A protein has these predicted regions:
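Functional beta-strand-loop-alpha-helix junction segments that form "active/interaction loops"
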Residues: 1-25
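Terminal, contiguous helix-loop blocks that mediate binding/assembly
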Residues: 14, 21, 25-28, 40-42, ...
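Short beta-strand segments
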Residues: 35-37
């Protein structure tokens, strides 16, 4: 046991920042990646609460995505990757929010089936820290669900690999399109 904590909510931004700070301080490595698994709602207004990640216990014990970004920013470390094993964390809004706290994001733009990510198939690639290996992580996810589907299950999934440094460019280009078509969009 490296450190024990009193009972607390893991979706509290101060708790998350402290645990990550402790983890980084105790580690001899200089590069870090994160895996988060839970429930999430992205920016969907039809899901309550909108812009939420995680659920600690029952009820509304969730963390708003902007608070999660703030918690990760507080550790003053840019992560090599964040893998979100949670629904809706691959949307553009979420990717833009996390653009300054990690280099790459691996996630699903839709629901993540109960099977989740097939960790045993891709852990050997995840911590190598290059885009080609992150692509292999995504391919293992695709292969896993293709295999389930071919076995007659109704399993399906989506996965995305997002290069965070491209998010500002995407936002800039999207803004140009919105301005250019504002009259059409108003209707």
């Amino acid at each position: 046991i490296v450190k024990e904590y009193d009972t607390q909510y893991s979706v509290d931004k101060d708790v998350m920042s402290q645990v990550l700070t402790d983890m980084i301080a105790k580690s001899s490595t200089t590069k870090f990646g994160l895996i988060f698994g839970s429930h999430a709602s992205s920016w969907l207004n039809s899901i309550y609460p909108s812009r939420a990640f995680g659920q600690d216990g029952n009820g509304d014990n969730t963390m708003l995505i902007p608070d999660m970004v703030e918690a990760l920013s507080a550790v003053n470390k840019k992560f090599e990757f964040i893998l979100f094993d949670a629904c809706y964390m691959g949307t553009t809004e979420v990717a833009y929010a996390f653009r300054n706290v990690c280099n790459y994001q691996l996630s699903s733009v839709m629901e993540v089936p109960a099977y989740g990510f097939p960790y045993e198939d891709f852990m050997k690639y995840l911590y190598k820290g290059n885009v080609d290996d992150y692509k292999k992580v995504c391919q293992s996810y695709i292969d896993f669900y293709k295999s389930l589907y071919s076995e007659g299950t109704s399993a399906w999934a989506t996965v995305s690999l997002i290069d965070s440094k491209e998010m500002d460019y995407l936002a800039s280009e999207l803004k140009k399109e919105i301005v250019a078509h504002k009259n059409v969009l108003a209707n």
